[in-house]
């Protein structure tokens, strides 16, 4: 198991890679589907295979609350529970504790909080997070960190970085599932020197890969790129780099140009549930009246199950009637669209044409 760089772009930091996990090989750069509660919303595992999904992301916080560690242990882990044979990455639960949970109380050991579901009290820290991820049996586990909001003042960012580093050290020392890789998470907000400090300290601890956290939390796009630029130079070249919570096509392409290999986001499934289709040339509101009589596919040239078999008119009809099939078809399309985009991106790196690919992506955005 490990990460191998197969080819590098001559004009940018984009690289083509291969990440080997206990449940299979992942071609990078990769977009990972979010399956918060052990399911990518509206999709079956066979849909994920057909849409060329490579990795599913599970959320430790949500899985800890329900179904809980006892149920997952009885099932033999999340792979068996959800019948997904491919790689699974789990986040640590830190983001959800800081963004969803109520009545938070911090200590050096972690965070005591009340569930957003029923108010029941829980405690989650680096030891508890890694123990839960061991039960889940994910191929890649993330260290427990403190995810900062935007904006955030320097004093809080500095104390958060120190805590994130301490928690990373504790996380690294916990028992892991067999074959489980562990990634560190760089924090530091918009402060370049803090991100450098965090990255360098995490590298000293030593991890199988490194994530750039605290981005895509409401900051301007230029601040997101600044955070990536402030982190990547201090991360090992021979380890995968992962920007958390990012799933917009042009933003992923820009980050790949900066040397990033992995991404995840709820965008493709979430906007599908609101009637929006992802296409190479931009998002399309399928609920719009202009598609009432349109007999073309959701996206011309798309080979997903939805576009091969159904029209914009029909999908719009389903959405207008609140039929579950409409959400499912549009989710299939959106997940396929992002995975196709990443496959095309990888091929452009392989063919030494990433610069042209990036220029085309930028032209669609503009």
For each feature predicted by the language model, list its residue ranges.
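Non-catalytic, usually N-terminal nucleic-acid engagement modules in DNA/RNA processing proteins
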Residues: 1-176, 289-292
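C-terminal extensions of enzymes
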Residues: 1-18, 26-30, 42, 145-151, ...
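Structural signal for hydrophobic packing residues in well-ordered secondary-structure cores
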Residues: 137, 168, 172-175, 206, ...
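Glycine-rich phosphate/ribose-binding loops and adjacent secondary-structure elements
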Residues: 162-165, 174-298
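Conserved, mostly hydrophobic/aromatic
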Residues: 24, 56, 91, 133, ...
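A non-catalytic, amphipathic alpha-helix used as a structural packing/dimerization or gating element
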Residues: 128, 132-136, 159, 163-170, ...
């Amino acid at each position: 198991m490990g990460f191998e760089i197969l080819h590098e772009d001559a004009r940018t930091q984009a690289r083509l890679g291969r990440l080997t996990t206990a449940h299979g090989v992942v071609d990078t750069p990769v977009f990972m589907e979010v399956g918060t509660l052990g399911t990518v919303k509206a999709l079956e595992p066979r849909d994920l295979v057909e849409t060329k999904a490579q990795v599913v992301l599970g959320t430790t916080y949500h899985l800890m609350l329900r179904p809980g560690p006892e149920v997952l242990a009885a099932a033999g882990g999340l792979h068996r529970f959800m019948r997904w044979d491919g790689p699974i990455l789990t986040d640590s639960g830190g983001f959800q504790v800081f963004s969803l949970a109520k009545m938070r109380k911090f200590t050096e050991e972690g965070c005591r909080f009340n569930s957003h579901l029923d108010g029941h009290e829980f405690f989650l820290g680096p030891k508890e997070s890694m123990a839960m991820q061991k039960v889940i049996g994910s191929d890649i586990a993330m260290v427990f960190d403190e995810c900062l909001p935007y904006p955030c003042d320097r004093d809080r960012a500095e104390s958060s970085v120190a805590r994130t580093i301490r928690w990373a050290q504790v996380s690294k020392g916990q028992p892991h599932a067999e074959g489980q890789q562990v990634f560190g998470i760089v924090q530091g907000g918009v402060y370049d020197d803090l991100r450098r400090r965090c990255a360098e300290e995490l590298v000293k601890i030593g991890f199988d890969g490194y994530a750039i956290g605290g981005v895509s939390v409401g900051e301007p796009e230029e601040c997101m790129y600044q955070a990536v630029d402030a982190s990547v130079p201090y991360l090992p070249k021979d380890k995968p780099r992962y920007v958390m919570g990012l799933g917009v096509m042009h933003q992923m392409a820009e980050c790949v140009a900066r040397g990033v290999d992995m991404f995840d986001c709820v965008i493709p499934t979430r906007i599908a549930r609101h009637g929006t289709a992802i296409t190479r040339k931009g998002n399309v509101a399928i609920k719009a009246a202009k598609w009432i009589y349109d007999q073309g596919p959701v996206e011309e040239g798309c080979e997903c199950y939805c576009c091969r078999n159904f029209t914009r008119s029909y999908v719009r009809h389903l959405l207008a009637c609140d039929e579950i099939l409409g959400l499912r078809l549009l989710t299939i399309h959106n997940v396929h669209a992002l995975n196709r985009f990443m496959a095309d991106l990888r091929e452009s790196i392989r063919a030494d044409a990433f610069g042209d690919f990036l220029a085309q992506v930028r032209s669609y955005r503009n």
